[in-house]
From Swiss-Prot:
Gene3D superfamilies according to UniProt: Transcriptional regulator MraZ domain
The species this protein was found in: Ureaplasma parvum serovar 3 (strain ATCC 700970)
Major location category of this protein: cytoplasm
Keyword flag Transcription regulation: yes
A GO cellular component entry from the record: cytoplasm
UniProt name for this protein: Transcriptional regulator MraZ
Family: Belongs to the MraZ family.
Gene: mraZ
Subunit structure: Forms oligomers.
Length: 145
C-alpha cells in the first residue's frame, strides 16, 4: 500500500529523486510505469499494479468503445521508466507539460500508486476538496463503501 505525501522537486533535466520512503515501498523494482492520471497528475505504478489497472479497465468494459478509447489513451501516454543508480526517474517532457509541472511537486501515495502533482495544481485541488470531504464520505458511506 502506497501512502503519505512528499514535497519534492524535479531538476533541470526533468529527473525526480525518488524519496527514500517511497523507494522502500517499491521494493526491488528497477522500473516504474508513468502515465497521465485522470486529475491532471502523473500516475506512478509498479508493473504489477499497472497490469492490474489495465486489466480492470478491460474487465469492467469488455469490448466497449469506451474501454478501447480509455485503454488507447492511457497506454499511448505510458512510459516504462528505469530507476537509475542514484534513485532518480526521468519524467518525459509531454507528461511534465500535461501535468503543468514547473519545478516543485508533491508525491502522494494513493493505495495502489503514487501520484505526482505540480505543487500549484495540487494546492488548488486540495483546497477545493477539503471543503467537500465530509460530503464525499457521506455519499460513499450511503452507497456502502
Amino acid at each position: 500500500m502506497f501512502i503519505g505525501t512528499y514535497n519534492h522537486s524535479i531538476d533541470s533535466k526533468n529527473r525526480m529523486l525518488v524519496p527514500s520512503k517511497v523507494k522502500a515501498t517499491l521494493g526491488e523494482a528497477i522500473f516504474v510505469y508513468l502515465s497521465l492520471g485522470f486529475d491532471g497528475n502523473i500516475d506512478m505504478r509498479l508493473e504489477s499494479e499497472f497490469n492490474q489497472f489495465v486489466n480492470n479497465i478491460n474487465n469492467l468494459l469488455i469490448g466497449s468503445k469506451e474501454a478501447r478509447n480509455l485503454t488507447r489513451l492511457i497506454l499511448s501516454q505510458t512510459y516504462k521508466i528505469e530507476i537509475d543508480s542514484a534513485s532518480r526517474i526521468l519524467i518525459p517532457q509531454n507528461l511534465i507539460d500535461k501535468a503543468k509541472i514547473k519545478k516543485d511537486i508533491y508525491i502522494i501515495g494513493t493505495n495502489d500508486r503514487y501520484e505526482i502533482w505540480a505543487k500549484e495544481v495540487y494546492d488548488d485541488f486540495s483546497l477545493n476538496q477539503e471543503s467537500t470531504l465530509s460530503d464525499l464520505a457521506e455519499k460513499l458511506l450511503i452507497n456502502g463503501i
